[in-house]
Curated annotation (Swiss-Prot):
Mg(2+) binds at D84, D126, K127, E449. One of its GO terms (biological process) is L-valine biosynthetic process. HAMAP family: IlvD (MF_00012). This is Dihydroxy-acid dehydratase. Disulfide bonds: none annotated. The active site is at S475 (proton acceptor). Belongs to the IlvD/Edd family. Homodimer. [2Fe-2S] cluster binds at C52, C125, C197. It comes from Sulfurisphaera tokodaii (strain DSM 16993 / JCM 10545 / NBRC 100140 / 7). Keywords: 2Fe-2S, Amino-acid biosynthesis, Branched-chain amino acid biosynthesis, Iron, Iron-sulfur, Lyase, Magnesium, Metal-binding.
Length: 560
């Protein structure tokens, strides 16, 4: 037996002087034998706010069985969840990115307060997987994550749909393109049950990242929430934690710079969500790994996009699962020498060993995942932009638009609500560049996602004719000429704060540029005249967050 297996919990529960501590455990039915084993947490992101995590409390019981089979004593605790799809387009969305930090802090609080020897993380939706992985990196004790899985595709008049279709239908209805009955039918049928939004949006992207980083069991990201494979993976994940404790393998042994390069490569090859840029930066920060936006752009330029999934493509996560999930993508990348195969993972084996042992289904797959030699695009799905409007950087999801260059007049709005109203009132014209500012990490605060606005633009048929730039974020379901994470943000006096209606903005994804066609003298003059707006919140969580949060170019982490 590894003598360090109970190193942490012995400090809380070992020795005669800890008799009162043990009494609390015995009040819940634990025995001396239970307490003598490694005591581990099962961190479950769960509430009844939405379907993304609703099934995870049940799966936690299966994880506990796996832990017990490996010789551990499991203790379940929950972490809070914000359902982005419900908070979207409201003040509630300001709490979404904040919840990532709250999840990480919650795990730290419970695990450290009770001296757990390790933990399993169960998480679905957008911010809980990155929050859990941040906690894993921060605490650096044996731990493993299992993503909760996607919902199944919905159905509208015989066609598969996802929540993306409902958002875009709002814009189509406002334009008179569809009937109220069609909108209602989509609303009623887009999400048929438990699990996360069906396309390669933020949640499913972060599910892929759990595997690509080496923090989850191979193949565990793609099974739908209702698939029986979820039960198998839940059990095996609990059992795998006990092996990690036995061999002393910790997250920072896994989360090397090369592991992050692997994750970024999978992100770029799959055309995943721009939110993954923020989250990978934040996980790297917690792991003590120096990762920058330049690393993302460098890897994007060498990585072909080989996956055909919504929002830019045709297929949902359910379809990817049927052809092999993350291991299929990673095998193709490894064979092309685009992944580091020698990186260690939570199995105790390397990426290469895992992929050699993983059995892919023998089914046609090139309609969803192409060979490296015949990609959908020659470079990655996300491009980092810099220039006079974004000295620190900005992101564009090139996999979700055919337009790589756009030049047009600015239509400036100081909030998402102002912009959304203008779009619904059809005040946005072809070639315009909608600017939504003061929605950054500090300015929002909380860096809201602009899905209501972007979907309305697309729904009105302007997705490839109107551009949008913001210091806020985008949902993974966003498509069109959409540039986000513009840094520095408006609230700290970034160049986006200096824009005026009619200024000519140039988006050049081919060359990685985001500029305003103004002389430096004019920008300096406007900067001298600019005054910071007063804080939107003077007390409470959002006020605290605004004071501590860093730039989106650093992952919007809290600086301490």
């Amino acid at each position: 037996m590894n003598p360090d297996k109970k190193k942490r919990s012995n400090l809380i529960y070992g020795g005669y002087e800890k008799a009162p501590n043990r009494a609390f455990l015995k009040a819940m039915g634990l025995t001396d034998d239970d307490i003598a084993k490694p005591i581990v947490g099962v961190a479950v992101a769960w509430n009844e706010a939405g379907p993304c995590n609703i099934h995870l409390l049940g799966l936690s019981n299966i994880v506990k069985e796996g832990v017990r089979s490996g010789g551990g004593t499991p203790r379940v605790f929950t972490a809070p969840v914000v359902i982005d799809g419900i908070a979207m387009g409201s003040e509630g969305m300001k709490y979404s990115l904040v919840s990532r930090e709250i999840v990480a802090n919650t795990v730290e609080l419970v695990v450290n307060a009770h001296g757990y020897d390790g933990f399993v993380a169960l998480a679905g939706c957008d911010k809980t997987p990155p929050g859990m992985m941040m906690a894993m990196a921060r605490l650096n004790i044996p731990s493993i994550i299992m993503y909760g899985g996607t919902t199944l595709p919905g159905n509208f008049k015989g066609k598969p749909i996802t929540i993306q279709d409902v958002y875009e239908a709002v814009g189509a209805y406002s334009k008179g393109k569809i009937t109220a009955e069609d909108l209602r039918l989509m609303e009623d049928n887009a999400i048929p049950g438990p699990g996360t939004c069906g396309g390669l949006y933020t949640a499913n992207t972060m599910g892929l990242m759990t595997e690509a980083l080496g923090l989850a069991l191979p193949g565990s990201a793609s099974p739908p929430a209702v698939d029986s494979a979820r039960v198998k993976y839940a059990y095996e994940t609990g059992k795998a934690l006990m092996n990690l404790i036995e061999i002393g393998l910790k997250p920072r042994d896994i989360l090397t710079f090369e592991a992050f390069e692997n994750a970024i490569t999978v992100l770029m090859a799959s055309g995943g969500s721009t939110n993954a840029v923020l989250h990978l930066l934040a996980i790297a920060y917690e792991a003590g790994v120096k990762l920058t936006l330049d690393d993302f752009d460098r890897i994007s330029q060498r990585t072909p996009e080989i996956v055909n999934m919504k929002p830019g493509g045709e297929y949902a996560m359910y379809d990817l699962h049927r052809v092999g999930g993350a291991p299929l993508i990673m095998k193709k990348l490894l064979e092309a020498d685009l992944l580091h195969g020698d990186v260690i993972t939570v199995t105790g084996k390397t990426v290469k060993q895992n992929l050699e042992e993983y059995k892919l289904p023998n089914v046609p797959h090139e309609h969803i995942v192409r060979p490296i030699s015949n990609p959908f695009n020659p470079t990655g799905g996300i491009r980092i932009l810099k220039g006079s409007l974004a000295p620190e950087g900005a992101v564009i999801k090139v996999s979700a638009t055919k337009v790589r260059y756009h030049k047009g007049p600015a239509r400036v709005f100081n909030s998402e609500e102002e912009a959304f109203k203008a779009v619904l009132e059809e005040k946005i014209q072809e070639n315009d560049v909608v600017v939504i500012r003061y929605e950054g990490p500090k300015g929002g605060p909380g860096m809201r996602e602009m899905l209501a606005v972007t979907s309305a633009i697309v729904g009105q048929g302007l997705g490839e004719k109107v551009a949008l730039i913001t210091d806020g974020r985008f949902s993974g379901a966003t498509r069109g000429i959409m540039v986000g994470h513009v840094a520095p943000e408006a609230a700290v006096g970034g160049p986006i704060a200096l824009l005026r209606d009619g200024d000519t903005i140039i988006i050049d994804a081919n060359n990685g540029r985001l500029d305003v066609d103004l002389p430096q003298e004019e920008l300096k003059k406007r900067a001298d005249e600019w005054t910071p707006p007063p804080p939107k919140y003077k007390s409470g969580l959002l006020a605290q967050y605004a004071r501590l949060v860093s730039s989106s170019s650093l992952g919007a982490v809290l600086l301490t």
